[in-house]
Structures are given as structure tokens and as C-alpha cells.
Design a protein with these regions (language model features):
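Sec-exported extracytoplasmic/periplasmic mature domains
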Residues: 48-55, 65-77, 86-89, 93-100, ...
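Structural helix-boundary/capping segments
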Residues: 70, 200-302, 310-311, 322-329, ...
Length: 529
């Protein structure tokens, strides 16, 4: 595995015993409180601890850096982190120096992992590709800038499936990301570094991108919450692109409430992304206000049966999902069976996906915007050979071979089929009076390391329609020698456009009723090692 470009010298101190967040000197005179566990911390919990003086922002950031030092390139060697931000500790100290000003911001001192396809002004954005090593954007992506304006600290850029083209999270710069719940398996993808890092307690929040599955797949595989928003709700300006038809971004977090908090900071119109014009008047005043434990009472949820597998390898996911469906009913939801072959994911991927038609023009445009990009077009990346050939070469060659993919008759035919499918999904919602559709994000458990195709995923429904979808922990497979607590399984809830508040409410009610989040055995509290 190539060495990771980690700016450790500016960020890390020697690991010494337990990672307990630095206490305020005044608070230290009081009886010692229980240790503050950064690995399970929430945004609300951190705000309270900072306000009370129980922790400092510097101590919080150091706590996460210590866990990264212990578990990313040591211990289980998760390989979730591509680069640390050398300014993170200084930014934390600035918060502590102006605690009143920082506390006034909704995300004051919230350390974040950003997938390495988010432009950042102080860190290269490489997409995990050796061909783009050192590529330095001139400014932050809009989403990153808004998070910082809300007080967040970019702690690190996360490893990912190279160029976001696949689902096993392997890259030429960062190597293979491991799933902390089963170190022999992949973490889903393409946002797998964010997924593994958030599961392992490397930060307080994470951000991913999703063309087909790529936020919700790592959420599903790592016992997390992943929200793909309505296309246009969050700006894509400064995000390394794959498909203008299918791309969206969103948070990956340990709780639904944290996802709502990050969404609130990012959502809204942006002149740099014309798609966001549709979001005018659509941003909820408070997504947190929708988080009610009884939100499932009276909800009508369509269970899309064609998105469940029927083969032996699907049995574990089906078992977990049945338990989750029972929990939805117990919480007051009405389940409506949807038997509709139009939702068949493999057919939608095969016949309607437009990534190879759009990728070349979009990537060439993005590379032209990076002042020092080592290659200025897709042809240059291909010619360099500096990418994970087994994972990417077939796609890159297919995309480059299209002289003008978006002018091809088949591309236009696919757009027509996408429009028809989107209209059909809207009709299903209306005819059945549904609040959301329900299905497993993956029909089977995430594949073992070494396989290059993350088979049997269902994310294409949201990818083609642009509808929002949230993935929440549904349970885990049976325990095994390599997965002491089982492999996590996620449940997708897909809603109509701009229904993020409703989806967050449904997901929150399920989360509160089930309480399924557990820290992986491979990354325990440091003092417990």
C-alpha cells in the first residue's frame, strides 16, 4: 500500500494512555466527571460539554487525532484517512480562545471527515488517485465553506473508492479501506473512508457523495446514518463530479440528530450551482424540529419487495430487515406491500444509468478548474496509468471513448427513461398515499476485501429520481469469527422531493425505538485496550 500523505507532525502527539478529552482547569477542581468518550460523542453532547467547561475544543480534536493514530495505520489499520489537516489543532485553540464567539455558531468545534472529493483550500483534493496527488483547489467547496462558517473544523480528508467510481473503497493513494466491524470485508463505498472513520470514532461528523449508492452503502455497512438529499438541496459546487444527472451529497453520522444538524448548515441556494435554484423556499427552518420519537405513528411506508433478494446469500439481510419491519409496525407505521418490477435495481443500473455518458465532460471541466492539477483531462489520467487499474480502467476507457457522450442518441433515450421512471415513482407515492418507501440498501452483506464489485445494491432508485433517501442501522448479521458482533445492515427510507424533514423524523423515531448503534470491537475506547 502506498504511504498515506498524513501531515502528522503538525497534528499528532504521542499516544499516552486513555484518550480522554482535556478538562477545563476550573472544572478540574470539581469532583472528576465520568470520562468524555469522543468515539460515541454527539454534536449536542459536545456543545453541552464545551459550555460547561468539561472539555476544551483542543482536547476534543486531540482525542480524535489519538484514535486515528491508534487505529488507522496501526492496530486494525483501517486506512480510512487520506490526509490530516495540519491546521486543525490551531483552529481548535482559536475556538477555545474565543469560546463565547464559537459557542454562538451551531457547529462550533465540530470536527469533520470530508470525503476526498470535496474541495478544500488548505488540503489537496485527489479523489484518492495517484494521478491527482497534490491537486490543490483554490477554494473550499460550497458545502465545506458553509460547514466552516457554522463553526465546524475540517479534521481530515477521507480515503474513498478512487474517483468515486465503485463501491469497495480502494484507491491508488490510500489503499483498501477496511470495515471496522469485520476487517476481512469492505466498508461499502464509494464514501468508505468516511464510513469506516465515523464508525471507529475518528470524528464527530462526516460528509460523503452519492451518485448511486455511495453515502448510504457505507452507512449501511458501518452501522451509521447516511442521508442523500434531494438533488439541488445542497450545492455541488467544488465537488469532484461523476454525473450531473445522478450526483448528490450529504452527511454520514452516528445519529439522526447529527445528520440533521449538518444538513441545516449546508442546505440552500448557491449561484455557483444552478440546480440549487429549485431549493428556494424548500429548506426547512429547523430540521431538528422534525425529530420526534412518535413520528412513525400513522406513517404509511411502502415495502418494495423487488428490492429484497431471494437467494441464499440474501438470507441474513432479509432476516435483519424483517426484524426492522416489525419494529416499524410496532412504532405505529402501516406497511404497504409494493410489488412492482419497475423498481428492479439491476435493470435500472443496466438500462438507465448515465455515468459513462456524462463523466468525461464533467471531469475535464473540473480538472480545468484546479490550478495545479497534474492532468488537465481524463485522457491525461488514463495515459498516466496512475490509478487503480483493476478497479477503474474499464470505466475510464469507456468514458474516454465517448467523443461526446451527452449528444449520443442512447444518452437521450436514457434520460427519457429516467423521466418516465421518476413519474412512475411519484404515481406510486400518490396512489398508495405513502410517506416513504422502505428497502434494504444492500440485498447482501458487503463483499470481502479483494472483490471489486459491491454486488446487489439498491441505491439506484434515489440516484435516478433525485429523491432523498436516508439509511439507518437496521441490525447486524449473526456473529462470526471475523465479525464478533455481526456485519451491519442498513435500511433505506426514500421520500418525495424536499421531504428531508419527514425522512429525518421517521428515521429518528426508528433509531430511538431500536437503539442499534454499537462501537466496533476492533476500535474500542483507547483506555480499554
Amino acid at each position: 500500500m502506498p504511504p498515506i500523505a498524513l501531515a502528522r507532525s503538525a497534528c499528532l502527539v504521542a499516544l499516552a494512555g486513555a484518550v480522554l478529552v482535556q478538562a477545563d482547569p476550573v472544572a478540574a477542581q470539581a469532583p472528576a466527571p465520568a470520562p468524555f468518550r469522543v468515539e460515541d460523542a454527539t454534536i449536542a453532547g459536545v456543545r453541552e460539554a464545551l459550555a460547561s467547561g468539561r472539555i476544551t475544543c483542543r482536547g476534543l480534536v486531540q482525542g480524535y487525532l489519538d484514535r486515528i493514530a491508534a487505529y488507522d495505520q496501526a492496530g486494525p489499520k483501517l486506512a480510512a484517512i487520506r490526509a490530516l489537516n495540519p491546521q486543525a489543532l490551531a483552529q481548535a485553540e482559536a475556538y477555545d480562545a474565543d469560546r463565547a464567539g464559537g459557542a454562538a455558531k451551531p457547529l462550533g468545534c465540530v470536527p469533520l471527515l470530508l470525503k476526498d472529493n470535496y474541495d478544500t483550500a488548505e488540503l489537496p483534493t485527489t479523489g484518492g488517485s495517484a494521478a491527482l496527488a497534490g491537486a490543490q483547489p483554490a477554494q473550499d467547496a460550497t458545502a465545506a465553506a458553509r460547514l466552516r462558517a457554522a463553526g465546524a473544523i475540517v479534521l481530515a480528508k477521507a480515503n474513498m473508492q478512487e474517483l468515486a467510481l465503485g463501491g469497495v473503497s480502494v484507491s491508488s493513494l490510500g489503499g483498501q479501506v477496511r470495515n471496522p466491524y469485520d476487517l476481512t470485508r469492505t466498508p461499502g463505498g464509494s464514501s468508505g473512508g468516511v464510513g469506516a472513520g465515523m464508525a471507529a470514532g475518528f470524528a464527530l461528523g462526516g460528509l460523503g457523495s452519492d451518485t448511486v449508492n455511495s453515502i448510504r452503502s457505507p452507512a449501511s455497512a458501518n452501522n451509521l446514518v447516511g442521508l442523500r438529499v434531494t438533488q439541488g438541496l445542497i450545492s455541488l459546487a467544488g465537488i469532484m463530479p461523476v454525473s450531473k444527472t445522478q450526483d448528490a451529497i450529504g452527511p454520514i453520522t452516528r445519529t439522526v440528530a447529527d445528520a440533521a444538524a449538518l444538513l441545516q448548515a449546508m442546505a440552500g441556494t448557491d449561484p455557483a450551482d444552478p440546480l440549487t435554484a429549485a431549493a428556494a423556499g424548500k429548506v426547512a427552518p429547523s430540521y431538528a424540529a422534525a425529530l420526534k420519537p412518535d413520528a412513525l405513528k400513522g406513517a404509511r411506508l411502502g415495502v418494495v419487495r423487488v428490492l429484497f433478494g431471494t437467494k441464499p446469500e440474501h438470507a441474513e439481510v432479509n432476516r435483519v430487515m424483517q426484524t426492522a419491519l416489525d419494529a416499524l409496525e410496532a412504532a405505529g407505521a402501516t406497511l404497504v406491500r409494493i410489488d412492482d418490477p419497475a423498481f428492479e435495481a439491476d435493470a435500472l443500473n443496466r438500462e438507465d444509468d448515465v455515468q459513462t455518458y456524462e463523466y468525461k465532460a464533467l471531469m475535464n471541466g473540473y480538472l480545468a478548474s484546479i490550478p495545479n492539477a497534474p492532468h488537465k483531462d481524463l485522457a491525461g489520467i488514463l495515459a498516466s496509468g496512475q490509478f487503480h487499474r483493476a478497479a477503474l480502467e474499464s470505466f475510464l476507457k469507456a468514458a474516454e471513448a465517448r467523443r461526446d457522450g451527452m449528444a449520443e442518441p442512447e444518452y437521450k433515450a436514457r434520460l427519457g427513461r429516467i423521466a418516465a421512471f421518476k413519474a412512475h415513482v411519484a404515481e406510486v407515492f400518490a396512489a398508495q398515499k405513502l410517506d416513504a418507501l422502505v428497502y434494504p440498501l444492500q440485498k447482501r452483506l458487503v463483499v470481502p476485501i479483494g472483490e471489486l464489485n459491491q454486488a446487489d445494491r439498491n441505491g439506484i432508485v434515489a440516484g435516478l429520481t433525485g429523491y432523498p433517501a436516508i439509511d439507518v442501522p437496521a441490525g447486524s448479521s449473526e456473529a462470526s469469527a471475523t465479525a464478533p458482533a455481526g456485519v451491519p445492515v442498513g435500511m433505506d427510507l426514500l421520500g418525495q422531493p424536499w421531504s428531508e424533514a419527514k425522512l429525518l423524523g421517521l428515521a429518528y423515531a426508528f433509531e430511538q425505538a431500536t437503539n442499534l448503534r454499537r462501537l466496533p470491537a476492533s476500535t474500542p475506547p483507547l483506555e480499554a485496550r
